Amino acid sequence: MGISRSDLEETMSKPPDCLPRMLRGTPRQRVFTLFIISFKFTFLVSILIYWHTVGAPKDQRRQYSLPVDFPCPQLAFPRVSAPGNIFFLETSDRTNPSFLFMCSVESAARAHPESQVVVLMKGLPRDTTAWPRNLGISLLSCFPNVQIRPLDLQELFEDTPLAAWYLEAQHRWEPYLLPVLSDASRIALLWKFGGIYLDTDFIVLKNLRNLTNMLGIQSRYVLNGAFLAFERKHEFLALCIRDFVAHYNGWIWGHQGPQLLTRVFKKWCSIHSLKESRACRGVTALPPEAFYPIPWQNWKKYFEDVSPEELAQLLNATYAVHVWNKKSQGTHLEATSRALLAQLHARYCPTTHRAMTMYL
């Protein structure tokens, strides 16, 4: 998908054929051209340095030393009967869920024992006999209402305006293509099937089935699509898909995600600011405490000790907790500590928490 690291390095090592032509012209034009070339070169070098030095997150690298099987606990779940699914997506080729990923799915499965929790992973082949064996897939398979399935993006985007966009996106390089793919996938998924979508860095505290045609406010200026709950073929999602393609810009972080949802909601409600309205025409934007009780700027609070009383007060009006994995990944967590995140693991995903205490 896109341009590989080796392709990018090879491209950068060759001077462009058009460079001599670009350097013709007045001295001012040459200075401007050299500035643009230098800026782009610096940007690409910085990304290559990031690839070489950072690599996979620490917790992801640690996963490969874990056992591949997990003894399933005794679970007394009722038969799945509730309509609608709860979806999780992995749009990269990773097939080895992190502990936070496992906790997200487990907490959703426990909070919705009568609902189907569907985990779609792009890296899984259709042939289940060729699936990798790892702790994450083994643990999540313990839950009778969890289904793990391969994700075919071309099939998902079929018969939507996203199909042509995705075809082109596979042949160009962009810095934020993976998160952009995730942004596109979630709105296409809910538009086609309806249900609830959650990012894999959520911990679900309460049943979400009574939430329909809703999303969450991240701050007073912006919405967030880490949680979405919509009916199938809802016009708001159709508008999001059209806006995604019509105003596409993959070079600005969040332009196809939170910013897209924010501008579409403003258009939907005919408002200029989120302060003017939080519900209109059947779509509701829930307050930050519902899904984002701790702002991303304060993500370290998840790793600080809290008392049970403070925890209860903090999450009194919260349905699910977004952990801001983009910021927190790789941060050490002592599973048996009184840290806020450790307490959430112990209470809402006890099977994952037990695995953490055994293997971390």
UniProtKB/Swiss-Prot annotation:
Gene3D superfamilies listed in its UniProt record: 3.90.550.20
EC number(s) from the headed UniProt entry: 2.4.1.228
Residue intervals on the Cytoplasmic side: 1-30
GO cellular component, one term: Golgi membrane
Subcellular locations according to the entry: Golgi apparatus membrane
Pathway: Glycolipid biosynthesis
Annotated domain remarks: The conserved DXD motif is involved in enzyme activity.
Keyword Lipid biosynthesis attributed: yes
GO MF annotation list: galactosyltransferase activity; lactosylceramide 4-alpha-galactosyltransferase activity; toxic substance binding
SUPFAM superfamilies: Nucleotide-diphospho-sugar transferases (SSF53448)
GO biological process entries: globoside biosynthetic process; glycosphingolipid biosynthetic process; plasma membrane organization
Residue ranges of the TM segments: 31-51
Pfam family, one: Gb3_synth
Keyword tags: Glycoprotein, Glycosyltransferase, Golgi apparatus, Lipid biosynthesis, Lipid metabolism, Membrane, Signal-anchor, Transferase, Transmembrane, Transmembrane helix
Glycosylation site residues: 210, 316
Taxonomic source organism: Rattus norvegicus (Rat)
Tissue specificity annotation: Ubiquitous. Highly expressed in kidney, mesenteric lymph node, spleen and brain.
Protein name, entry field: Lactosylceramide 4-alpha-galactosyltransferase
Reactions this protein catalyses: a beta-D-Gal-(1->4)-beta-D-Glc-(1<->1)-Cer(d18:1(4E)) + UDP-alpha-D-galactose = a globoside Gb3Cer (d18:1(4E)) + UDP + H(+); a beta-D-Gal-(1<->1')-ceramide + UDP-alpha-D-galactose = alpha-D-Gal-(1->4)-beta-D-Gal-(1<->1')-Cer + UDP + H(+)
PANTHER family xrefs: LACTOSYLCERAMIDE 4-ALPHA-GALACTOSYLTRANSFERASE, LACTOSYLCERAMIDE 4-ALPHA-GALACTOSYLTRANSFERASE ALPHA- 1,4-GALACTOSYLTRANSFERASE
Keyword Signal on entry: no
Positions occupied by motif DXD motif: 199-201
